[in-house]
Curated annotation (Swiss-Prot):
Function description: Catalyzes the reversible cyclization of carbamoyl aspartate to dihydroorotate.
Annotated protein name in UniProt: Dihydroorotase
Organism: Pseudomonas aeruginosa (strain ATCC 15692 / DSM 22644 / CIP 104116 / JCM 14847 / LMG 12228 / 1C / PRS 101 / PAO1)
PTM-bearing positions, type N6-carboxylysine: K100
Positions that bind Zn(2+) 1: H14, H16, K100, D248
Family annotation (SUPFAM superfamilies): Metallo-dependent hydrolases
Gene (UniProt): pyrC
UniProt entry keywords in alphabetical sequence: Hydrolase, Metal-binding, Pyrimidine biosynthesis, Zinc
Pathway: Pyrimidine metabolism; UMP biosynthesis via de novo pathway; (S)-dihydroorotate from bicarbonate: step 3/3
PROSITE patterns hit by this protein: DIHYDROOROTASE_1 (PS00482), DIHYDROOROTASE_2 (PS00483)
Annotated GO CC locations: cytoplasm; cytosol
List of residues binding Zn(2+) 2: K100, H137, H175
Subunit structure: Homodimer.
Amino acid sequence: MSDRLTLLRPDDWHIHLRDGAALANTVGDAARTFGRAIVMPNLVPPVRNAAEADAYRQRILAARPAASRFEPLMVLYLTDRTSTEEIRTAKASGFVHAAKLYPAGATTNSDSGVTRIDNIFEALEAMAEVGMPLLVHGEVTRAEVDVFDREKQFIDEHLRRVVERFPTLKVVFEHITTGDAAQFVREAPANVGATITAHHLLYNRNHMLVGGIRPHFYCLPILKRNTHQEALLDAAVSGNPKFFLGTDSAPHARHAKEAACGCAGCYSAYAAIELYAEAFEQRNALDKLEGFASLHGPDFYGLPRNTDRITLVREEWQAPASLPFGDFDVVPLRAGETLRWKLLEAGA
């Protein structure tokens, strides 16, 4: 068993960097490992057009560490009123790489999202024409649907219909959490892919709920039972190019997580590739990590693969109990615990 693992530099195809003072922390954590990242647009107000995407992009670039070449790939936030002209302008910009479907009320800052899928069909047609991928938070939001069933329900009610109606539209089913989603993606045409988070590979709902409620495991879509966790691991290590890395690293200040009504999201960017390495090692599949982390994503998006490399070493280290997050602090995934892999920093 090797104690070193060298990969083409990976990318993160789903990250939340937040905004304002927090960028000084989140951008550096992402840039430490990733060459590029698909940056989620659910700010307040959301990133709805190319001009807003460019302004956000400039704020991210200004927060990059010195000499960093980290590239933010911007995303539009779809609303019921997103026009075909906005889609075409965004595509022509060269820096907007996708548009995101948030069902209204599904997750953090999704209140401006889509109320009926049919309301964005003209926008989706334009996206298919210009070659802009659709990113999907795949959960229904009706109050009567159990929170653990919302992903499967979304597939049956909406996603199958979208994929069938727009056969040339690239669709990324983001942060999948169920065996149902993995099976859907495997059986779908080649234009449908999926991201998988490290926390959904490493944990299930027992980790969040048994022995006390652990708010730093709370995310949306919520952690599912262990059989779904195993199905996600099967997909991730399969070598199937439809599945690729997307951390869904989503920081919230400690007081917003450790609360009577805590926010959803896990902060993993600070040690993302190390966490994925642990998950792949559980399956004796470290040889499949480079494909999942560094190859499948750019290939799906039609972007060049990175050419530089990173190296992980088998070395135990203790994750910090907290990290700075603007004017507050954030408790990262695995806070205070031992990690088994460590990114070898440049010059080390």
